[in-house]
Amino acid sequence: MRRSVWLLLLGAGLFLASACKAQQPPTPEYRLTATIKDIMDSMVDPSADVLWESVATIVSATGTEERRPKTDEDWANVRRRAITLVEATNLLKMPNRKVAKAGEKSENPNIELEPEQIEKLLNDDRQAWTTLSTGLFDAASVALQAINAKNAEGLLDAGEKIDAAC
């Protein structure tokens, strides 16, 4: 009987000790497919363009056109693009993502560095890249808040912040 009580107490003690130990969640396994350039070309740029073009004043020979989302469908479309832009910034910050495919050139003629050179600069100062990506996240989040409030002026102001962050 004494032995049973002792084993029971030992078992309970081991159980409690293991319960007190913080369980670490498994590290997520990311399967990176797209490069930073791919994300910029397919998610960031097109989404930012939709936000910028959704609120505008266009003056031409035929007159002045005020562009604003008007219907729930218009607002939903702009919202989808804002969410894409916000979440794309998280993808940009994921570790080990390649800048571009080897030998792939930017369409911007002002970018003279090879992808490997850009990647080295980025990896040498990861904090700067994270800060830039977070700035875009913050600006796009302001746009999303304006869209959720159906505030065209707020979206216009947020568009300027997105432009500055880009």
Question: What name fits each language-model region?
Answer:
Residues 21-79, 83-86, 90-165:
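Sequence context surrounding c-type heme c attachment/ligation sites in exported
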